[in-house]
């Protein structure tokens, strides 16, 4: 939250990314919790690999992550989202597991701190669910 407040005071844009591990319950139930942990670690590795050093990332829930990106506007956020999803594909291939490391991602770009951090997280979460739903429909 201090980073978010700093961006608000400096009137800088900030992007809040919400990332959800896909199929974690299925992976845990089918392959065991060690494999579920492998998916979580794969997502964390993707975050470290793709997002810039000034980004602040945190595990938000059992299978969710939030990443704050100071000074990040929409075009850069879209580029980082694509790079993150590509990184997960590469991580999946390197693991040779019986499942793919996949995540759904949504983001909210806020200019001049016009919303609270909680509002941004909730909006990014909603956009993540829209992404998840659209990808599921595309695969069917």
Give residue spans per PLM region.
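Catalytic-core segments of nucleotide cyclases and related cyclic-nucleotide turnover enzymes
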Residues: 29, 78-85, 89, 93-96, ...
């Amino acid at each position: 939250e201090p980073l978010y407040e700093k961006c608000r005071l400096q009137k800088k844009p900030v992007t809040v990314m919400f990332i959800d591990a896909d199929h974690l319950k299925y992976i845990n139930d089918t392959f065991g919790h060690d494999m579920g942990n492998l998916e979580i670690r794969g997502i964390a590795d993707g975050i470290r690999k793709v997002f810039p050093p000034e980004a602040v990332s945190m595990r938000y829930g059992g299978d969710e992550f939030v990443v704050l990106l100071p000074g990040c506007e929409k075009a850069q956020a879209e580029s980082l989202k694509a790079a993150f999803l590509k990184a997960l594909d590469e991580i999946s291939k390197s693991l040779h597991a019986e499942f793919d490391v996949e995540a759904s991602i949504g983001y909210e770009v806020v200019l001049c701190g016009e919303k609270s951090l909680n509002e941004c997280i909730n909006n990014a979460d909603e956009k993540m669910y829209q992404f998840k739903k659209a990808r599921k429909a595309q695969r069917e």
